Amino acid sequence: MSINEVRYLPECGSTNAYMKEHFEEFGPVGAVYTTNQTAGRGRLGRTWVNAEGKALYYTVAIREPLAQPATLPLLASLAVRRQLALRYGVDCQIKWPNDLLLNGKKIVGILCESVCYGYQQQGRGILCGIGINLAQPQSYFDAADLPHGTSLALQGAAIDLEQDPGWLAEALTDFGFDQPLYTFARDGFAPFREKYKAACVNIGRRVTFDLPDGGQGAGEAVDVDEEGRLVVRTDSGEEHVFTGEVSVRGIYGSL
C-alpha cells in the first residue's frame, strides 16, 4: 500500500475538509499538507486555532480496506512520534488515544474521520488529519486559551520553517505511513501494540473516563488491548474504553 500523491497547499480551510472534497482525485492512498489552515477543528469538535506558517497540517486519505480502521489514530501517533524523534531528538509521550505530549504539554493533535465516495456514496474511506506545533510562541497559546499546548520551538528544538514542514510531510509519507500501512492494513493494531504501550502516558496512572450512559468512571489505566482500547481497572472490574474523553492524573492539570 503506497501513498500515490502528496499535494502541498499554500492555504486551505482544513486539510481533512479538502481531502473530503477531492478524495476521488487521489489514488488508493493520498496525502495533502499546508502550514496555513484557517478553519481546522480538533477532536470532540474542538477548534484547532491557525498559526500561519508556524505549524504543519497533514492529512492522509485511505480507501484501501483496513483490518482495524478505528485504530488508525493510534498508528498515526506512533508514526509522528518516530519522525519527531528522528528529526529533533525529542521523546514524546502518547496520551491515549493519539495526542502527543512533550514535557507534559500537547504538541500534536490527530483527528480521524470516515468519508463516503463514488457511485451513490457507496465507497468507504478514512481520513487521518495531523496538526504539529512547530514554532508558535507562548503568546499564541495564551491568546488561544490553550494553557496545555506547546510547540517544538518552545521546547528547545531548532526549527527551520522554510525546510521542516516539507521534510516532515515527506518523512510521514515515506516512512511514517507508507511502510507501516502494509502491515497495518493486513494485521491491524496488534503488531504495533507493544511500542504504543511503551510510549503511552496513561499506563500506570489514575484516569477518569466517560461512560456510555453519560456518567464518569475512574480507575488505573493498566493496558491497551489489541483493539486499541484503554483498559482501566476500576473498583467494579475492568473497563475497556474506546471513545469519549479520558483525563489522566498529572496531565493537563488533572488531579
Give the label of every model feature segment:
Residues 1-90, 106-108, 115-116, 254-255:
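N-terminal lobe of the biotin/lipoate ligase/transferase fold
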Residues 65-67, 74-92, 102-255:
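Long, positively charged amphipathic alpha-helical accessory segments at protein N-termini or as interdomain linkers
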